[in-house]
Amino acid sequence: MENCYCIEPQWPADELLMKYQYISDFFIALAYFSIPLELIYFVKKSAVFPYRWVLVQFGAFIVLCGATHLINLWTFTMHSRTVAVVMTTAKVLTAVVSCATALMLVHIIPDLLSVKTRELFLKNKAAELDREMGLIRTQEETGRHVRMLTHEIRSTLDRHTILKTTLVELGRTLALEECALWMPTRTGLELQLSYTLHQQNPVGYTVPINLPVISQVFSSNRALKISPNSPVASLRPRAGRYVAGEVVAVRVPLLHLSNFQINDWPELSTKRYALMVLMLPSDSARQWRVHELELVEVVADQVAVALSHAAILEESMRARDLLMEQNVALDLARREAETAIRARNDFLAVMNHEMRTPMHAIIALSSLLQETELTPEQRLMVETILKSSNLLATLINDVLDLSRLEDGSLQLDIGTFNLHAVFKEVLNLIKPVTLVKKLSLTLHLGPDLPVFAVGDEKRLMQAILNVVGNAVKFSKEGSISISAIVAKSETFREIRVPDFHPVPSDSHFYLRVQVKDTGSGISPQDIPKLFTKFAQTTVGPRNSGGSGLGLAICKRFVNLMEGHIWLESEGLGKGCTATFIVKLGIADQSNESKLPYTSKIHENSIHTSFPGLKVLVMDDNGVSRSVTKGLLVHLGCEVTTAGSIEEFLRVVSQEHKVVFMDICTPGVDGYELAIRIREKFAKCHERPFMVVLTGNSDKVTKESCLRAGMDGLILKPVSIDKMRSVLSELIERRVLFETS
């Protein structure tokens, strides 16, 4: 120890160490006691911490450790046995708690590690969700741009505006330096620059369609990046540019329109595409992003649809213009046809009036001659003249009827009539001819055939007369039979005609008329010709002539009455059967009671004269006036004539019982004249009967006469029998009027 140079401390070494141990144990105990307090505080603040009981163990362990260090302060000096026992107890408890805590950590540490793993997993999930949210936001942004671009593209149906709007909106949305659209030429061998973003009229730029870059783009439905030096991308100036921006190209399908053809579009027999090229700004680090490429692809599809709609609209407008031109041409043709029809009708009306006037003279004078004493040869000549005149008058009527049937102006005059009387009247008219030709004529009316019917009596009689007259015309010998029955449903099944569909009902019935003859027959190939105008067939002898207008008019009358007509013949020389079915209404009792007594009048007036009956005749045609006067004088009438309106108004008086007037008299309207006569004779029984004697057979004339208050209408020509019948009916009405 003599050679040791150690410095003696101020306090002894044992005391210094003890002091440090005192201080250390105190602070260790303080720390141990504060840590459980902090744990208790944070556990109370945390509502989701799952290991509360573990913290209790840690707290107990730490408190015991602190208590051990605190008790240890009294063990450095002399201490009692109690302190040693307390110290030992604390250390034992600390050992037990620390071992239990250590054992529990074996189970807790894996859970804590899994918590860390879950934390990392959640962080990864959060990062993935952030990426998905970013993608969703990008998609929403892309969708918004697509909707905006689609709205702009669909705002018009002009294809030039569509394409220009597409380039402008894409350039604005994607901040493009240039955007161009290359369209295929009509030959399909080249692409022509049609629209650009900055050039107004890009013309003269064409590239072959078989370039590799074009083939690559056309073979894919995606937007592809292409070289900025590609021929389809060489549109922007390169002066002062160091790095060209990225370029993408996408195909635009030109949809196939099989029913349309646009003049300046390529032939679309094969699948064709246009090419849209989009260029990013030069000298920038910007690159195409995925959502931008998707936007370009969607816009290309929308442009294709919009172009197809525009093409359809253009063709529709072109078709509309063509249709309007055709309508104008059709309207012009219709007006020309109507003008021609009016001219024809006017011509026929004039010819009708002018032909009936001389026919009136011929028939009237011939009928007067018939009632005089003539030699057989003279009577035969007069009868021949009268028959020929009646035939000519019938032909005139047929021509007018056919004209009105063809232009649709002829309508049925529906009324209640005696159906049996119609057939008896036909029999009476045809019988004289059959007697001359020595033909047997029979009539059979079905037991269920109603006596009265509703329909057009005149047209039905005309149809029957035409068919029967045709049978008489082509029969030199043998017989003719007429049968009329109510058509049954079984009969309808035998008739298979496309435009004839009879419908049974309680309000109407179908009349079936059949005329059989043993005449010259008809060749089967000639049957369809018989219903045409002035048909010439091999029917009968050559001097019999054609079928004229009779069957043609008859067919049209039958069609008007919702019926059907057909002919049957086994061949030449084997006769013929003509059958037609027409629709007639069923008459009720009230309509039957209102039927006129025409048949009675005709029966009682066959040889009646009218001595002393004062009649006034007004006609501007001297021949017609004289002929009418001759007929009336022959019937015993006292006749006064007038050749002008002034003369007529001057001589007409209450003494005149009947007035015959021609409504076509020049100087004043005949209808106006009738009104003036009605005004002149205030009392109805003082006014003479007013009868129109005219050559106009149209329906308008008849309706005008009824409106003007005329009492009758007679069509020229007029025979003596017809005049006698008219006067008898007028006198019968006057008697009925005076006795009522």
Curated annotation (Swiss-Prot):
Quaternary organization: Homodimer; disulfide-linked.
Tissue specificity note: In seeds and placenta.
Residue numbers of 4-aspartylphosphate PTMs: 662
Gene Ontology cellular-component terms listed: endoplasmic reticulum membrane
Residues covered by the GAF domain: 158-307
Species per Swiss-Prot/TrEMBL record: Cucumis melo var. cantalupensis
Protein name from the UniProt record: Ethylene receptor 1
Catalytic activity entry: ATP + protein L-histidine = ADP + protein N-phospho-L-histidine
Cofactor(s) recorded in Swiss-Prot or TrEMBL: Cu cation
UniProt keywords, alphabetically: ATP-binding, Copper, Disulfide bond, Endoplasmic reticulum, Ethylene signaling pathway, Kinase, Membrane, Metal-binding, Nucleotide-binding, Phosphoprotein, Receptor, Transferase, Transmembrane, Transmembrane helix, Two-component regulatory system
This protein's record includes keyword Transferase: yes
Subcellular localization: Endoplasmic reticulum membrane
Function text: May act early in the ethylene signal transduction pathway, possibly as an ethylene receptor, or as a regulator of the pathway.
Family under the similarity heading: Belongs to the ethylene receptor family.
Positions carrying Phosphohistidine: 353
Pfam families, sorted: ETR1_N, GAF, HATPase_c, HisKA, Response_reg
Response regulatory domain boundaries: 614-731
TM annotation in the entry: 23-43, 54-74, 92-112
Post-translational modification: Activation probably requires a transfer of a phosphate group between a His in the transmitter domain and an Asp of the receiver domain.
Lipid bilayer topology: Multi-pass membrane protein
Main location: endoplasmic reticulum
Biological processes annotated in GO: negative regulation of ethylene-activated signaling pathway
Binding-site positions, Cu cation: 65, 69
UniProt cofactor note: Binds 1 copper ion per dimer.
